């Protein structure tokens, strides 16, 4: 259960009730629901790599829902393309806005993306305001992106290759 919009970094004390704590506290099957709404200012990227068997149910947030800001939201199980789709992520993520912006981006960050995993659904996700692509998934199996919006990326931002953002 998410009860705070706060986030923490690797060298900081974990904050119980935060979205990151709910994701990282266990590999056991779990469902994350929200008692709060607003903007979560991420202190680092949010990765599901090591934390499978997860449902994030964003529509439980009251009011205007949840926006993730400052960093990307990534689904990866392997960084080796020779492996192809890695293990089962077994994840469902619904009703979130992913808008990293460029304040902390030091390379081509996507708003939400992932590679080399199996078994995941994203639903009613809005992805935008990224330095690189907004919604990027490849090398995956049994993956569904439904009722999602891939909106504008930041073409003239701080991408290492110059004008870049390709939506």
Language-model features: locations:
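Short, conserved catalytic or adaptor-binding loops enriched in Gly and charged residues
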Residues: 1, 58-60
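Right-handed parallel beta-helix
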Residues: 53, 57-58, 86-100, 116-129, ...
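Acidic glycine-/aspartate-rich tracts in secreted/extracellular proteins
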Residues: 6-8, 30, 37-39, 60-63
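Right-handed parallel beta-helix/beta-solenoid
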Residues: 1-16
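Extracellular beta-strand-rich solenoid/capping regions of secreted or surface-exposed proteins
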Residues: 15-28, 40-57, 64-94, 100-117, ...
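A cross-family glycoside hydrolase active-site/sugar-binding cleft signature
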Residues: 35, 136
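Conserved positions at the start
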Residues: 80, 109, 122, 132-134, ...
């Amino acid at each position: 259960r998410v009860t705070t919009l706060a986030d923490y970094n690797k060298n900081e004390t974990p904050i119980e009730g935060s979205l990151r704590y709910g994701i990282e506290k266990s590999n056991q099957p779990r469902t994350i629901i929200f008692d709060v709404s607003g903007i979560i200012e991420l202190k680092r990227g949010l990765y599901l790599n090591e934390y499978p068997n997860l449902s994030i149910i964003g529509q439980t947030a009251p009011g205007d829902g949840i926006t993730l800001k400052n960093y990307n939201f990534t689904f990866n199980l392997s960084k080796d393309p020779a492996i192809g789709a890695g293990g089962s992520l077994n994840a469902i993520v619904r009703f979130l806005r992913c808008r990293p912006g460029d304040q902390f981006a030091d390379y081509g960050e996507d708003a939400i993306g992932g590679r080399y995993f199996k078994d995941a659904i994203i639903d009613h996700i809005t992805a935008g305001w990224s330095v690189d692509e907004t919604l990027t998934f490849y090398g995956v199996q049994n993956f569904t992106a439904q009722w999602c919006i891939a909106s504008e990326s930041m073409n003239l931002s701080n991408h290492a290759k110059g004008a870049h953002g390709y939506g």
